[in-house]
Amino acid sequence: MVRKEPAFSFGVRPILNLFIFIFFFSTALMDANETRTATSRRLEEARQLRLSGKFVESLKVLENEVSQKPGRKNSSELAEGWLNIALNYWNLGEVSRAENAFIFVQALADEKNDQAIKNYARTSLEIIRLYQEAKRKRREKSYQEAEAIFLSGINLARKNGMKEMELKCLRQLNLLYWEIGEMEKFASCSESLLSIARLLNNRHEEVRSLDSIGAYYSKKNNLSLSFLYFNRAIALAEKENLLEMVPGSLTNMADVCYRLGLYSLAVYYLEKALKIYEKQDDLDSTISVLYALALSIYRQKENNPAYFAREQPEALLTTALELSRQVRNETLEARILNNLGYISINDNLDGSEQYLNLSLAKGLKLKDKEVISSALNNLATINLKRKKVQQAIRLYEQALQTAREINNCEEVWEDYAGLADCYEQLGNFSQAFKNYQQALATFEKIRDNINFDFYKIGFDRGKRKVYEGLIRVLVRIKDSQGDPKVDEQLFNTINQLQARVFLEEMDTLKRGRTPNASSNELAEMEGVINDFFNHDENLGEEDSFGELLELEHRYLQLWITEVAEGNKKERKEMSPQPSLLNLQENFLTDGQAILDYLLGQNESYCFLFSRTEFQVFHLPPEKEIEKAVKLYIKLLADPVSEEEDLKKVGAELGRWLLPSQLVLSDFVTSLTIIPDGILNYLPFETLRLSFQESGDRQVYLIEKFPVSYGLSLASLYRSTQEAGWTDYKKEFLGFGNPLCRQKEKDQMLARLYFADNRSLSLRPRLSELPYSQQEIKRIAALFPAEAGDLFYQKKATENQFKALDLTQYRIIHLACHGLVSEQFPLRSSLILASRKGSSEDGFLTVREIYQLRLRTELIVLSACESSRGLVERIEGVIGLPRIFLLIGSRSVISSLWAVNDLATQELMLEFYRGLLAGKAKHEALRLAKLKMIDSSKSHPYYWAAFVLMGEPGRIY
């Protein structure tokens, strides 16, 4: 109010006072308007914070605003302020506070007679009442009533356009559907939640909704989609600084990684989750993470004995067990006891049995079928190890029945595999085969939904015992029966399982499935990864390996998503596989033999295929072969190793690995090797033949046969069924001695460190390769003028290689440094030059090569250790040769170890001379090696490293 002024007579003074009155009156009005304007701004700021999901920040603004003297606010502003407070409390899950705030809003609206706000508050209070009643019914397990009441609240919110009220009711309904196993309703509800969360910019709920959709696909055993949604949830949570609010996304992602065989990535996510739960003093969740972490570390060490873990599985589980007993959580205790029993089976049967019996007893008490089925399976395994086969069968069957009841596919296939092992020990091979087939069929349902080869390889990693078991029992049946039908069945099984991921991906690429390499998101993620390598502080950091793993897999997810978008209508049809008769009549030539190897825990096999024969030879167990091969490779790769040592070990391996009738045969003229496991790193050409009559000198295998290598029978067969190209515009493309800038040399340290844990003290040197430059020049000179293109030093850039139409070249020769990573196989790379200011870093990685297309007759990787990579049993080596074969090259020559570049030049020149003279690829390589054997460079170090993979025939 304006204070009443006293009366004044006219004159100068009254006029002056009038102006003063007008001035102060106007100022008061301006102050009031400014106050209202400032209040409106703050209310709008709070509203925008709320709409962006920043509820706590919004509350701080509002509480400061409404705490000022009531006289400075009008009722409408107060009502609006308290309405925002109520909605913030609602969104934060503080329902009682939200209810009280809505009651106050209703009172303020009554005072102002603001019908709109009054109706909003009244409707909100009714929704809260329904929400609380539905939650009570859910706690009482009156699920139908709870669902109906939640739906009433949701419909009321929808009718009035109250999205925030609808969102929270939907969230609770979603939890109800999960609890009662209504998975399709759960999925639909999760999609609705995601849509509303995005509409409201509620990032917290968006993360939770993505996590829910991931959980749905995980439950449905669609591991690719569950990985995708969990990955999106975590990425968004990190971006919005919400990860501490949703650590469950990390544990969910870890579970999917575990099921995909990505154990080290699972460890990384679990360790991140553990830090959050410990900080929050969430003991139950901490215990859950501890036992999951222990199991992930155990499986990773089982897969890679050299794996370094900060904590040992048994110590983690013991800690988790003590904590579970302290908080009296019997459900967690039962699971931990089971896991303790599981990791003790190989070392302490009695101790393992004690843990498992305790776990089973608690599982039965709690009626926890997951614990019961797992404990029964582990107890069955103990009985099998003790040769109590009938008891083991009984326990496996009980475990199988329980696992089926809860649709636990992982447990079901393990039970079938256990039963197969039992029947195999009883000599009932047909029954064993049936159970192995059941195990295979069970996890194939999960595998069929995995949409990327690298993830399929990880998934297959834990299923080797089934793959090996199928082949092993068929070998037993073949040995005992000699039935041609069994031969066909064994052949088909080998064909089905060997390098199957390679064949599946080859079919996919033929259908045109390629990612959009220009995607902004992909380019951004590539930049993040490259930036990671540019920071020296990442070297030696204990979490750096996990961080790089996470970045790599995020890149893959973006890539896979783009592929899926471009191929939604794609049909998944596999190319037909050859029959044994077809292989022998239409593929194998007179004089050609194939040796196909399978390494096994108890015994290994060599399968000999020729036009007239299919024989099986029994070999020593994998560990014996592996020990001898590692020693031999060490001798081969050392140019000063003793000749006698080479002869001794080479002859022993020759006796083990080469069938005597093959070596003695005068009818075999060429040999193809399909290696398994460590044999992928063995140059069979160097094996000594000791079957000659006394007095004959001991010769290398290469002196008798030309040798080539293949990934599988099916892949070799398929390469011959496709017509070769004839319309090449150029004969030869050569890249040699790329000149690396200092930036690339600096990055090399980081890349080597993450590639193979190489010591930081062993600083890498990217030395120039002057002979490689001479190599490609001299090779190119063998071809007609204008028949080839050469790029070397500064011109041998990654940009240049990618810019070329590679399909126009018959032969591509890359003489450069190579970087092979067994820990990050998709980051293995060829090191080319890079231009200043270019977006390309000079490291041509496997996943970049995947985006290229070839139709070359031959790729020559004249680079250090370019044959190496991640060795996967049955699948082969995941590395550079494989990817070049996959994208369209008919064959690849690569090296098994670092070779002197002058010796490499000599070998390559001789090889190309033979090739251009019309020799088959494997024969040209053989002649080049024989020439070196007869020279001063006769040591295998100089000539044995280079091997031919793929189609071995003539080019000219």
Task: Label each PLM-derived region with a short phrase.
Residues L43-L51, E80-N91, N119-R139, M165-E179, ...:
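Conserved alpha-helical positions within TPR/SEL1-like repeat arrays
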Residues R50, L62, K69-P70, Y89, ...:
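Eukaryotic all-alpha helical interaction scaffolds
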Residues F230, L270, L631, L658, ...:
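A domain-level signal for caspase-like cysteine endopeptidase catalytic cores
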Residues S430-K704, S715-A750, L760, A781:
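Amphipathic alpha-helical protein-protein interaction segments
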Residues E573, Q577-N582, E643-L653, R763-R827, ...:
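Functional beta-strand-loop-alpha-helix junction segments that form "active/interaction loops"
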Residues L716, R810-E910:
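Catalytic cores of nucleophile-dependent amide-cleaving enzymes
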